[in-house]
């Protein structure tokens, strides 16, 4: 029997409507692709068992959130408790790339993370299967953005052709697990501090 601890990792996928968030989620979890997905209202999630670095077992919840502005307010309620945030843009859509920083900032405002400076993000430039003439966002521009936001890992992907999706989500799982463990340790430290303060108070309040 394995003694390995199983963790539940929550991963949020953000980005403009139509960049391929739902397609990426289904490609990774189910290894399937469809062009018939409807716009996500609020949020939806799928789960997948993952093994990180060969010996760490976890259940990853991949949350797909609304990209359309009229549905965004429904999705922010699901940001809290996230262990990693994936920011997706479409390499054929300049505005979706320009909005990456806004999505990151919105997440940090609503997610209430313990340490915004160190919280893990991953950027995915999707639809690299598109014809070269239709690609607008260069890899260099994406690398510069990723660096400016704190050296965020960047992957160019194709949900349609299953390019780089598994590799990207391996990094996402690793980052999420590290964040999950850091949050757990911080909670345990705070809990132990609270217990020690209470015990010290009881010891100092003796009756004379």
Curated annotation (Swiss-Prot):
Residues noted as binding GTP in the record, renumbered to the chain: 17-23, 33-40, 67, 126-129, 158-160
Subcellular location: Late endosome; Vacuole membrane
Outcome of mutating residue 157 to P: Reduced nucleotide affinity leading to increased turnover between GDP- and GTP-bound states without the need of a guanine nucleotide-exchange factor. Suppresses the zinc, caffeine and calcium sensitivity of CCZ1 mutants
S-geranylgeranyl cysteine-type lipidated residues: 206, 208
Covalent cross-link Glycyl lysine isopeptide (Lys-Gly) (interchain with G-Cter in ubiquitin) as placed by the record, residue numbers: 147
Cellular component annotations (GO), alphabetically ordered: cytosol; fungal-type vacuole; fungal-type vacuole membrane; late endosome; mitochondrial outer membrane; mitochondrion; multivesicular body; vacuole
Highest taxon listed in the record's lineage: Eukaryota
Subunit organization: Interacts with IVY1. Interacts with YIF1, YIP4 and YIP5. Interacts with the HOPS complex. Interacts with the class C-Vps complex. Interacts with VPS35. Interacts with VPS39. Interacts with the GDP dissociation inhibitor GDI1. Interacts with CCZ1.
Protein name from the UniProt record: Ypt/Rab-type GTPase YPT7
């Amino acid at each position: 029997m394995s003694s390995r601890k199983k963790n539940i990792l929550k991963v949020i996928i953000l980005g403009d409507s139509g960049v391929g968030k739902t397609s990426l989620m289904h490609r990774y979890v189910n290894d399937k692709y469809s062009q018939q997905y409807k716009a996500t209202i609020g949020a939806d999630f799928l789960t997948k068992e993952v093994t990180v670095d060969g010996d760490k077992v976890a259940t990853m919840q991949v949350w797909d959130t609304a990209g359309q502005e009229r549905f965004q307010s429904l999705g922010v309620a699901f940001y809290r408790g996230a262990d990693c945030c994936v920011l997706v843009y479409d390499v054929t859509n300049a505005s979706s790339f320009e909005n990456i920083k806004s999505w990151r900032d919105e997440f940090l405002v609503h997610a209430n993370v313990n340490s915004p400076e160190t919280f893990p993000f991953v950027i995915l430039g999707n639809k690299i299967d598109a014809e070269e003439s239709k690609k607008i966002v260069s890899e260099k521009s994406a690398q510069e953005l990723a660096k400016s936001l704190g050296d965020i890992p960047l992957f160019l992907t194709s949900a349609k052709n299953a390019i780089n999706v598994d590799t990207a989500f391996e990094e996402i799982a690793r980052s999420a697990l590290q964040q999950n463990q850091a949050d757990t340790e911080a909670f345990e430290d705070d809990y132990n501090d609270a217990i020690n303060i209470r015990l010290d108070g009881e010891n100092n309040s003796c009756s004379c």
